[in-house]
Amino acid sequence: MSDPFKSEAPKADAPKADAPKAEAFKTEAAASEVFALEGLDLAALVASRVCHDVISPVGAIVNGLEVLDENNQDEDMRAFALNLIRKSARQASARLQFCRLAFGAAGSAGAEVDTGDAETVARGVLDDERTKLIWDVPRRLMPKNRVKLLLNLVVLAGNTIPRGGVIQVRSEGDGFRVVAEGTNPRVPAGIRELLAGHPANGHIDGTLIQPFYTGLLARTAGLSVTVAVEPGGVSFNVASA
């Protein structure tokens, strides 16, 4: 199963094998220098991203129902359609639960979220036959924007290993570290700039909103994100700004 949240628009920059040091770019740019989106525009783009994530399994459910309507006497086709509907419904539910926590309000402005819930929704969309999720974050209540940041970084990490691999999530001091390891890991083009709030040509659309939103979460929480290319993988390191 491929990464359900992969954005296919930007091409990727593959890391050089002989690079002695990881390249890093931080998100602590001054607020006056950061690209600003109007509230309605931000909401519209995030909503577009959520719809993009959910439309595939919902469409598969519709296809399964059509197969049932057209082949209700064929037992093999009926079994195929029911299996497709069942699998797609579970997938749609998992993606909606993830999006609710990663993009939604999750309670009042000062709400805290159980990191155990974050692990559950992350496993629902990323832990499959191609990608293994190793979650090493102690279960506790965490400010919701930190949890949202963590979940969005897990998605970004998944996008760096399109062929699958291992994603490790662990706490480090006041922050956390998300590492993706797999075959030919790569950092999608422009992701550092989007995390920093500096989109190319001052343009953001539904395919680019997720990394931009991730950087916005980091700045709101008083954190910085460092993206580093390492031997065999890519890491996202979060610390106090």
Task: Give the role of each language-model region.
Residues 44-71, 143-171, 210-220:
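Conserved ATP-binding N-box helix of the HATPase_c
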Residues 230-237:
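Glycine-rich nucleotide-binding loop
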Residues 78-132, 183:
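Conserved DHp (HisKA) dimerization/phosphotransfer helix of two-component histidine kinases, i.e.
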Residues 174-209, 239:
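Glycine-rich/acidic phosphate-handling loop/turn and adjacent ATP-lid/helix
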Residues 1-11, 16, 21-42:
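Conserved signal-transmission helix
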Residues 222-229:
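Glycine-rich ATP-binding loops of the HATPase_c
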Residues 69-81:
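Conserved catalytic segment of histidine kinase HATPase_c domains, centered on the N-box/ATP-lid region
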Residues 35-45, 130-156, 162, 199-206:
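Conserved short strand/loop->alpha-helix "switch" segment adjacent to the catalytic nucleotide/phosphoryl-transfer site
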